[in-house]
Structure formats: C-alpha cells, structure tokens
Amino acid sequence: MQNIGAPHFHPRRLLAAVLILELVSSLAGCASLGLRPGETAQTEAEESAKGLAYYHFLEAQQCLLEDDFAGAIREYEEVLKEDPNSARLELELAALYQRQGDIKKALAHVEKSLKLDPKQQEAYFLLAGLHVGLNQLEEAIQEYEQVLALDPDNREARLFLATLYAQQRRFPKAIQTIQSILRLEPDSVVGHYYLGRFFIETDQIEEAKQELQRTLTLDFNFVPAMFDLAVAFEREKQYNRALVMYHRVLRHQPNNTRAWANIGRVLLIQNHYGDAQRAFARVKSLEKGDPAAGFNIGIINLEQKLPDDAIREFRPLLSNPRYQERARYYIALALEEKGDLKAATREYQLVSRNSEQFIPARLRMAFLLYQQKEKDRARQVMDEMQKLAPNREEVYLTSSYFYEEENLWDQAINVLKEGMGKVENPEEIYFRLAVIYEKKQDRDESIAYIKKVLELEPDNPDAQNFLGYTYAEQGINLDEAERLIRAALKAKPNSGFIIDSLGWVYFKKGQYEKAVVELERAYHLMPQDGTVAEHLADTYLRLKRLPEALRLYRRATELENSNPTELRKKINELEFRLRGHSL
C-alpha cells in the first residue's frame, strides 16, 4: 500500500503576507493611543523591540527565498520572543522544523499553535502528517477527524483518512470513506482509483476492475490505474490482458521497474523463459543490479537447465541479508542439477536454521546423503527433523521414502502413522499409506486409507484414480471405478495415468474396442511406461492383433514400471501361438 501520508507543509508566501499584516498591526498598535507624560521612555523601548522583531521577520523571509530554512527558523524564533501569542508564527515554525526533520520541535510548535487557535485546518493537517511519520496512525486519524469537524466536505482529509484505514487493514472503513468522497464528487479520479485499489486488497477483483476502468475513462493517461488494473487481471489469471496493460504503463514510463518486474513474473508463469529473462535483465540494468531481478533470472536459468548460469546469478546474493538463504538453497539445487551431490549437500547444510528454507534444505540434504549411500547420516538428519518440525508432513513422507526404497514396508508405515496424529492436514500421509499397503499386497488397508483421503478431499483426482484403478485391478466395483476415473479425468484431462486407468476399466469390462482407444492415447502420452505398454499389448491380444501385441510386449521389457518376469511369460506364450499359426 502506497503511503501518501499528509501533505508536506512548506513555507508559503501567503502565510508570510499574513504574518507581515499581523506584525505591522502590532507595531502600529500604540499609534492611536494617547500617552501620558511618564510613559515616553517605556514606549520608545517597546517601539525599538518591535522594530527589531520586524527586522528579524524580514530576515526570515529573505532566508526562505534562499531556501535557508535553518536561518529562517533562527529569525522566526527571534520574532516569537516579541510576539509569543502568534498562532500562525508557531505554525510556520512547526512546518520549518518538520522540513528540517526535527519532529519533536515541530510537534511542540504545532500543538502550541492549535492551543492559541484551535480552528486552524492547516495545523491539523500538519499535526496528522507528523503523527503518520511517527507511525502513530490513530492519533493522525483523530487530527483528520478534527479537520472534518471544521469542514465536513473536506475531500483531502477524507482521502488521507481512507489511506490510513487501509494501512491499518481496515478496508471496509477505507472503502466507506472513499465512497463518501465519490458522493461529494462522483467524477473524482483519485476517488475511483483508490476505491479500485482497496477492492484489490479485499479480493473483490471484479469491482476493482470496474473502478480502475472508470478511472481510466476519466483520465486515459492515469498510470497508477493502468498498473493496478494489470494487477487485477493478473489476480484473475488473465495473463495476456495483464501484459497488455503493463506494456501500456511502459509506453508512459519506459523505465518503470515494477512494470518490468511484473511482466517478467507473468512471462515466467506462462513458461516464456526467454522473454521473462529479458524483462528481469531490464530491471537489473535499471536498478543497478537489483537483487530481485537477479534472483528471478537465476530461477529462470534453473528452469531452463542452465545450472552454471543460475549459480552466477545467485552467488552475489549471498552477501544480501534478504536473499542470502534463498540464494544458498537454489545454489544447492543448481549443484544437484549439475550432478555435484557432495557440493550440493554442503550448501544445504549451510542454510540457517532461522530461515524458511531450513526444513526443505535439510530434507534435500537427507535425500542426497541417501543417494550417496550415507544411509545412517540420512536417517540421523531425519530423526533430527522429526524433533525440530514434528508438524510438517514432508518430514514423515521423506523418512518413509527411505524405508520404502529398501522394501521395509512396516517401518515406513510406522513412520507415517506417527506423523498421522501430528500434522494438521494428513491427506498426503493417508495417500502414501494407501500406496505402501498396495505394494505390501494388503489391498483392504490400501482402499481404507485412500477412502480417508476422499473423505477429506472428495474431488482429489489422484485419489479418485487410485481407488478406481485398484477396483479395476481386482475386477470389482467396475461401474464405480469408471465413475471415479471419469471424475478424475475432468480435473486432469491429459493425464496419461488416468487415461490408462479408464482403458483398463474398459478392458476389465470386456469392452476391448473402447479400451484400445484409451490405451493407445495413454501410450502416446507415456511411451516410456512399461505398465501402459503392457496394458495396450494385452488389449491387442484380446483383439487378435497378435503381431502388434508381441512387438509391444517386447518393447515393454525395456521400459520403466515393467514386470520382466510376467512379460517374458506372455512373450513366450504368444510366440508359441504365432508359431502354431504359421504351421
């Protein structure tokens, strides 16, 4: 939220003129009085003092013309000695002290000014601004309310009030206040703009778009409204419209780094890595090595499998306290990408315990230790993590993974069940338990745990597919299996796994023509998966397409997720049949 605060209170020539009038009036005060004979000496002394005050006042004005504010303060203080009850002089001094950064003296003078004359709107504005500078927002709000008590239609005070409410996250109050401005001035550009901003803050994106578009109708070149309208489009994932609006900002402000940075972010979301990198490079050049831009360029390099380039971007950020830990974490990821597991492990170990990256860094470190055959160290790290982060599901999932890799199903199950009662959202743990029980050939327990996932997340497509495929494998509840898998396919229409499951349900139902359509589609999406290839080969076999079946069985033996023993048996049987056909 942009803090516009109160207007900076500059010395004004109008105020100077008023002060001159006051001073001249006081100097001429005794001209019309009849003086008694004994009062002549006293009167001459007073006249001399007032003449001196007038001299200091003129000197103060000269200092202001020369922007010598410290000199003006000295001269005004001299004037104040002769005219201590001038509310306007106190106000002028308060403004000068504010300009010089002496908030304590500014407060003292403005408060004295208001004590002398409590109806000065300018003084309340200045006092409110001082309170904002001290982050005393409630006090500032009270001062603006005083302005409105004197002038209920004061739009400036209402606008500042609205921005203060927004700073306090009191957005309903901020919105009401801005709407009161628009009732007074329906075509207020600033009013519609801030209303749009506050709607964005409260996730009322449609209303925000309407207000910001209204702002641009009233002032086609109002750049802040363009920028925030782009943000609104981005929030709604209307990325192309957001890009159009950000580029419109750049037509007015070619070096607007926020617009370039947001363009880079949107392009990154759209996987347009080259264009995103160029946008962030522009930010980096404009901001003279902007760390955020360098960080984002590093991320893009990682996404593009350019680990050395990524490391070059991240290394300078190790000296930046804001980015240090994140940079170290991503340097470790880049080293992993390079295959330098030992160096990556060292970087993960250096991530500070107080950083957000500590837990993911430790989990990656344990995983790399396990890959490097340092299994005891890996488990030691995970034991430490279960004590440090007992509520994090990823800790238990990683620990169980190590046991799964060694087919130690019971140990994996025990770890997950320990975490099941500690994490807030155990869906992932339930899902993993279902998978492990499936591997353990305990399908009843597997089904029980996947149903727990669906109780918590009825529309979870992976859980729907898992249960549907499990039913299909067992040849039970095939209509329910088809319903579950079709529901999953709506959420993930291009998932090869789910398409394979649907084809396998058709196969189990004996609907081979329908099965082959889905399984060929799945195989096209996942040509390296042995299970999909085997399912398609089984279907070809049922359709008497024997040469195609044999070719695909042989191909499946070379793929991942295959059962070579079972495949060899099928190949031998089919080869025998084909030899018989050729006799």
Residue locations for each model-derived region?
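Terminal, low-structured helical/coil segments at or just beyond the last alpha-helical repeat
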Residues: 38, 476, 547-583
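Structural marker of alpha-solenoid helical repeat scaffolds
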Residues: 48, 82, 116, 150, ...
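Position-specific recognition of the canonical hydrophobic site in helix A of tetratricopeptide repeat
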Residues: 64, 91, 98, 125, ...
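Helix-start (N-cap) detector for alpha-helical repeat units in TPR-like alpha-solenoids
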Residues: 46, 53, 87-88, 121-122, ...
